């Protein structure tokens, strides 16, 4: 496999995906903007269920490409930056059933582009209730916020849901820890920089139930443990098979 550019995970093939060792969830990330329609959701679910049970080892995880979850193209512009710290957000919208996760990302992106006029969805990586990881905005560009802090230098992770109202599933914490561990090793960022949105601006984000895992040190410990075990190899999963994986998520598989 060719060495990826710094800050951009390598692309994983279907064969490599099936060979990844692991535990729960699958994941997401950056690709093209055209969405490929899967032909057989049930087949996709069968094909990926075995992989799901093996994906999330201490060293390997998948990122579902933008085309897989149906992202629009990013607009031109944005602020280039160098990532120096890590910040946790929640969606502040009840997710409920995880089948809603990809559609929420599409809704968030439309809102951010059409209502706020931003170049793209505000965050760099998203994590759903089942620990699937989605790449959102390019990590080369600073995120956006409707609050009063400067996002330059921040690696922004979005946990889907409203954690003032919803509990935080274990799988979602695992996915968030993996995303942050990947960022820490890729951008050489200390885990001591990890913060919640509310630490930087006047907001309840990332919600009381999720913030509890920050304030207690639980999330940082999870990230540190992953790094001590060798870090996280976050690999991009793109094309028809990735689109089929998203269709399976939306079908409840």
Feature names for model-found ranges:
Residues 2-13, 21-25, 29-91, 129-139, ...:
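Basic/polar, cationic surfaces and motifs that engage anionic cell-wall
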Residues 80-115:
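Active-site acidic/histidine clusters and adjacent loop/turn architecture
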Residues 115-116, 146-148:
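Short Gly/Pro-enriched turn/cap motifs at secondary-structure boundaries
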Residues 120:
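Short, small/polar residue-rich loop motifs at catalytic or cofactor-binding pockets
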């Amino acid at each position: 496999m060719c060495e990826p550019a710094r800050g951009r995970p390598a692309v994983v093939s279907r064969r490599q995906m099936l060979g990844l060792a692991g535990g729960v969830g699958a994941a997401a990330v950056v690709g093209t903007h055209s969405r490929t329609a899967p032909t057989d959701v049930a087949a996709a679910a069968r094909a990926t269920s075995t992989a799901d049970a093996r994906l999330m080892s201490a060293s390997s995880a998948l990122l579902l490409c933008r085309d897989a979850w149906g992202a629009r193209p990013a607009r031109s512009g944005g602020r280039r930056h160098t990532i120096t710290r890590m910040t946790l957000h929640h969606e502040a919208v009840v997710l409920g059933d995880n089948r809603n996760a990809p559609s929420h990302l599409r809704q968030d992106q439309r809102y951010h582009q059409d209502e706020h006029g931003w170049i793209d969805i505000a965050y760099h990586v998203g994590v759903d209730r089942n620990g699937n990881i989605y790449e959102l905005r390019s990590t080369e560009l600073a995120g956006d916020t409707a609050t009063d802090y400067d996002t330059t230098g921040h690696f922004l992770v979005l946990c889907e849901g409203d954690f003032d109202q919803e509990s935080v599933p274990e799988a979602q914490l695992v996915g968030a820890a993996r995303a942050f561990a990947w960022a820490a090793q890729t951008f050489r960022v200390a885990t001591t920089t990890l913060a919640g949105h509310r630490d930087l601006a006047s907001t309840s984000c990332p919600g009381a139930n999720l913030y509890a895992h920050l304030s207690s040190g639980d999330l940082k410990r999870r990230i540190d443990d992953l790094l001590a075990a060798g870090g996280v190899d976050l690999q991009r999963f793109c094309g028809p098979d990735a689109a089929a994986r998203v269709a399976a998520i939306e079908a409840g598989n």
